[in-house]
């Protein structure tokens, strides 16, 4: 027999699919209400009916496709170079002194493109996955793994939204909003006619009226959520980074990864315009290292700690992290001049001083 702990875990995994099932049932009912009750049973004009059905099915297809991709795209995990080797794990286990353990981790980290730190200035280490976290990577407690460029864990897709599927998530929000707006707009006149008793009471009345209320309500909530994530894309921030700015060697910098709105957009949607509206992976980079452009200190951000050289904080000439050769897709983002609005900026040094390293879950 399976252990009781395993059965309990499996039960919880099943419960995680309830929000997805709820969304699926709502969408399935909306399809029946719109196609059958509105278009087939209520609308009499053949031209109007045909146009509505064509546009509706196009939006429905793109919505389902992007939702599927968001749910079933496996989150990307850090490359093996960031994991501790078997030998390094044994060395850490044998060492009792913290300084000795830090030396081991320091040796591993010095050749990796890791430039973000914990709030205390230590290199970010996950003691559950036994790895040094790449920039923008976080450990998801729900998935129990480290996720590259983690944005958030979304219960409505039962998946982590991160580097592997953030574009799909954005398209899911966009097509969901368009779907709801289209249903609301085309259903409105028949909703009004049923409301004012302009049409006879039939089985379609309930479906058409409730469809209008549901679609309009979802439109409002989706509009706010989509607008927020559009803002995040333009700023090149994740939801986690919006709540807590990433920390670099010089301190926290909420604009540390921003390259300008257009380049930030390309990081998520890619260089190929033909793929921008399709839920096909086209994001730039590998999810482990990101180009960055440091900007002037934000007065709302904490000041540079005493004892640190203020010149380490760049006034912002475009400079990619890491100083090692970047992937071709990352290099393209940094071509053609500086980030918008950068003037008279000092160049940041490429030194990588040893820092205190601590574990971070």
Swiss-Prot record:
It is a multi-pass membrane protein. Residues 331-340 have a biased composition (Polar residues). Residues 124-174 form the DHHC domain. Residues 296-361 are annotated as: Mediates localization to plasma membrane and recycling endosomes. One of its GO terms (biological process) is protein targeting to membrane. It catalyses: L-cysteinyl-[protein] + hexadecanoyl-CoA = S-hexadecanoyl-L-cysteinyl-[protein] + CoA; L-cysteinyl-[protein] + tetradecanoyl-CoA = S-tetradecanoyl-L-cysteinyl-[protein] + CoA; L-cysteinyl-[protein] + octadecanoyl-CoA = S-octadecanoyl-L-cysteinyl-[protein] + CoA. The keyword Zinc-finger does not apply. Residues 1-15, 72-167, 229-361 are cytoplasmic. A motif (NPxY-like endocytic signal) lies at residues 352-355. It is an enzyme of class 2 (transferase). It is found in: Endoplasmic reticulum membrane; Golgi apparatus membrane; Postsynaptic density; Postsynaptic recycling endosome membrane. The DHHC domain is required for palmitoyltransferase activity. Belongs to the DHHC palmitoyltransferase family. This is Palmitoyltransferase ZDHHC2. It comes from Danio rerio (Zebrafish).
């Amino acid at each position: 027999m399976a252990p009781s702990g395993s059965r309990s875990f499996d039960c919880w995994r099943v419960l995680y699919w309830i929000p997805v099932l709820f969304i699926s049932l709502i969408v399935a009912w909306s399809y029946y209400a719109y196609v059958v009750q509105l278009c087939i049973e209520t609308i009499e004009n053949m031209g109007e009916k045909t146009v509505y059905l064509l546009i509706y099915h196009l939006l429905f297809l793109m919505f389902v496709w992007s939702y599927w991709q968001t749910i079933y795209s496996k989150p990307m995990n850090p490359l093996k170079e960031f994991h501790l080797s078997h030998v390094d794990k044994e060395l850490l286990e044998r060492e009792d002194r913290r300084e000795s353990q830090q030396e081991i981790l320091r040796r591993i980290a010095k050749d990796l493109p890791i430039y973000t730190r914990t709030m205390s200035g230590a290199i970010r280490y996950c003691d559950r996955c036994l790895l040094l976290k790449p920039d923008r990577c976080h450990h998801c407690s729900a998935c129990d793994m480290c996720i590259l460029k983690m944005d958030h864990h979304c219960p409505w897709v039962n998946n982590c939204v991160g580097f592997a599927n953030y574009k799909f998530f954005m398209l899911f929000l966009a097509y969901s909003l368009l779907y709801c707006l289209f249903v609301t707009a085309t259903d409105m006149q028949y909703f009004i006619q049923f409301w004012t008793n302009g049409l006879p009471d039939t089985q379609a009345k309930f479906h058409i009226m409730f469809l209008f209320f549901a679609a309009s309500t979802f439109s409002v909530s989706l509009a706010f959520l989509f607008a927020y994530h559009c803002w995040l894309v333009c700023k090149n921030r994740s939801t986690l980074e919006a709540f807590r700015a990433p920390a670099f060697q010089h301190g926290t910098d909420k604009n540390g990864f921003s390259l300008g709105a257009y380049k930030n957009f390309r990081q998520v949607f890619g260089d190929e315009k033909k793929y921008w509206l399709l839920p096909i992976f086209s994001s730039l980079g590998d999810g482990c290292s990101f180009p960055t452009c440091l900007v002037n200190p934000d007065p709302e951000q904490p000041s540079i700690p005493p004892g640190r050289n203020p010149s380490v904080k760049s006034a912002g000439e475009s400079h990619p992290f890491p100083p090692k050769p970047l992937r071709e897709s990352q290099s393209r983002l940094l071509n053609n001049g500086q980030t918008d609005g950068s003037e008279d900026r000092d160049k940041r040094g490429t030194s990588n001083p040893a820092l205190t390293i601590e574990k971070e879950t």
